[in-house]
Amino acid sequence: MKTTFKNIIRTIALTGSIVAVTSCPVYSAEYVSVTKDGVNVRTGPSTSNPVYMELFEGYPLKVVDKKGDWFKVTDFENDSGWVYSPLLEKRDNVIVNANSRANMRSGPSTGNAVVATLERGVVLELLERQGKWVEVRHASGTQGWIYAPLVWP
């Protein structure tokens, strides 16, 4: 009887552990973009916290924490702060993260023609990933391919 009771308790404890583990939130990298120009990044999750920097529409960010309606975010230079979440949305944008400039090409290879040269910090709409290349479109409408390690994320 004692052995059966111990087995039941052990089974309940194990089942509870499995439920507890599977119900824990799993955080994978979540990327968002700023919805309009002039969005403030603050030092804490409240409008009473000082503004750390101001961002423009489309700027991509990585969500690293959440507190109420606020997201703690980091950017491609690893600067971090808090943004009011309604000012962010899921959007496939990337930012040029090259040391100086990146060539946008007509196809996914260095053998293709350069269609534009982009400065560090230029935001682009991500259209497709193909191996180590990404197809992107600039707000001006210029479209092409960039070597993926030269953009973030």
Regions found by a protein language model. Give the residues of each.
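Short, contiguous, well-ordered secondary-structure segments
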Residues: M1, V21, P25-V26
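Bacterial N-terminal signal peptides that target proteins for export
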Residues: K2-A13
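SH3-family beta-barrel domains
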Residues: C24-T43, M53-E57, V64-D79, V83-S106, ...
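Short, small/polar residue-rich loop motifs at catalytic or cofactor-binding pockets
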Residues: T47-S48, T110-G111
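Bacterial N-terminal signal peptides
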Residues: T11-S23
